[in-house]
């Protein structure tokens, strides 16, 4: 089984086993409820078996390169958003920022990555405004890339992005992926996650 197909199968099976719909922008943030499954006390949806996280090599909106492979030793949270999202993306970013604040000294053990699904409108200026409005400035890296880089990333992470020319909004999978310090996909959080779940799980992800 290919790496991309394997990741897709793991994520889909985990979501279906908990009867969770992977919500997209324009859908209700309460479309599903995260239930802890068997595992080391994690409160998201635990992925079994745990697979190495797909590659991710982009740059933040200031131009600095960011590689997932360089973040070994930290827990990493990855989500896919866009600044013009009318509903779920602002909530995801706000809740991730709240979790990062709530972690206190443990915040040094996690890196939060938000990958654009709308590179045309996600300009550095738009990103700065978006993050500032949600208390997320300096609390996560908002990642951009060339069209080819982003297409590769979306495919590797099995992110469905509506790139049609007549789209009104960018429909996409609205979840957060939790990655261990060893670089393995351990857990997925549906869009109705709480900051408390992230605060609980980060120390566990950071030591595995």
Describe the function of each predicted region.
Residues 68-96:
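Short active-site neighborhood of thiol/selenol oxidoreductases, capturing the structured segment around
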Residues 21-24:
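C-terminal motif of bacterial Sec signal peptides marking the signal peptidase cleavage site
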Residues 77-78, 112, 176:
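Hydrophobic beta-strand anchors of alpha/beta hydrolase catalytic cores
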Residues 33-69, 94:
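N-terminal "domain-start" segment that seeds a small globular fold
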Residues 26-29:
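Bacterial signal peptide processing site
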Residues 2-14:
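Bacterial N-terminal signal peptides that target proteins for export
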Residues 147-201:
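Thiol/disulfide oxidoreductase modules built on the thioredoxin-like
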Residues 91-153:
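Structural microenvironment flanking redox-active thiols in thiol-disulfide oxidoreductases
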């Amino acid at each position: 089984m290919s790496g991309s197909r394997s990741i897709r199968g793991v994520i889909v099976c985990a979501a279906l086993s908990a009867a969770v719909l992977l919500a997209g922008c324009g859908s209700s943030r309460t479309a599903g409820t995260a239930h802890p499954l068997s595992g080391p006390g994690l409160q998201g949806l635990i992925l079994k078996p745990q697979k190495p996280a797909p590659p991710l090599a982009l740059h933040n909106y200031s131009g600095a390169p960011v590689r997932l492979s360089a973040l070994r030793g930290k827990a990493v949270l990855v989500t896919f958003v866009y600044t013009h999202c009318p509903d779920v993306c602002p909530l995801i970013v706000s809740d991730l920022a709240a979790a990062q604040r709530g972690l206190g000294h443990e915040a040094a053990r996690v890196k939060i990555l938000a990958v654009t699904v709308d590179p045309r409108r996600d300009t550095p200026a738009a990103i700065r405004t978006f993050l500032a409005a949600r208390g997320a400035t300096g609390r996560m890296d908002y990642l951009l890339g060339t069209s080819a880089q982003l297409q590769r990333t979306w495919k590797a992470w099995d992110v469905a992005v509506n790139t049609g020319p007549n789209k009104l909004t960018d429909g996409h999978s609205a979840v957060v992926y939790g990655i261990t310090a060893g670089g393995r996909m351990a857990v997925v959080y549906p869009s109705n996650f709480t900051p408390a779940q992230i605060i609980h799980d980060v120390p566990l992800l950071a030591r595995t």
